[in-house]
């Protein structure tokens, strides 16, 4: 554009010079020189302007390239940021998934713990029920044992009472005696007169022997047969009592029983008649 302007000015000047042909040559030369100088200066200015414009265009191009590079870098940075954001989102999502999975595992473990707790509570309830049953069973067993012990105590008390009575009877000496209104029946059966003192030292206690013989005779006929009389027979080492009882099953007869040194009772005649 500047070149065209310079050319136009030059052409104008040339036309002006031609129209002013009346001027002297020196003036023309001077004017021509000035014009040429001015044209040269303008041409230089135009060149300088063109150079500046070119430099400016280059700078613009460089700036444009720099801007493009900068934009490219910015795009790369944005892409990298987006990728990083995507990676972070992926990481966050993965972390969230892991957290959710962990929470699910925790919830599952919590549920499992709750189930185990329920199982433990159920097991504890069963154990308590078993303990209650065992306690009740032990209570029943203890009650049964106490009852058995009470029964044993009663039995022992009865045995002790019997033993006490027997001991009292054994320890307390009772001299042999005949029955009330006795009829000599046993006395008539014996032969001879053995040493009564020696015989009593070898024979059982008189009262015990009489009680045992009475029990045996009453059991024989099922009656209460009154005691009648006694006698001692035998010799040294072989003594025995002879007892007679009024036979209530067959009135007028007597039941004869003997008791030896070992305390053995024998009914020798259930219905003796003299």
From Swiss-Prot:
Membrane topology is: Lipid-anchor
Would you indicate the residue range of the signal peptide?
Answer: 1-17
Report residue spans for region: Disordered.
Answer: 18-169
Composition-biased stretches (Low complexity): 91-169
Q: Where is the lipid attached (S-diacylglycerol cysteine)?
A: 18
Q: Where is the lipid attached (N-palmitoyl cysteine)?
A: 18
Keywords, A to Z, come to:
Cell membrane, Lipoprotein, Membrane, Palmitate, Signal
Q: Which domain of life is it from?
A: Bacteria
Compositional bias ranges of the Basic and acidic residues kind: 25-76
User: Where does this polypeptide localize?
Assistant: Cell membrane
Gene Ontology CC terms, in alphabetical order: plasma membrane
Enumerate the PROSITE patterns for this protein.
PROKAR_LIPOPROTEIN
Question: What's the protein called, per UniProt?
Answer: Uncharacterized lipoprotein SSP0535
Q: Which organism is it from?
A: Staphylococcus saprophyticus subsp. saprophyticus (strain ATCC 15305 / DSM 20229 / NCIMB 8711 / NCTC 7292 / S-41)
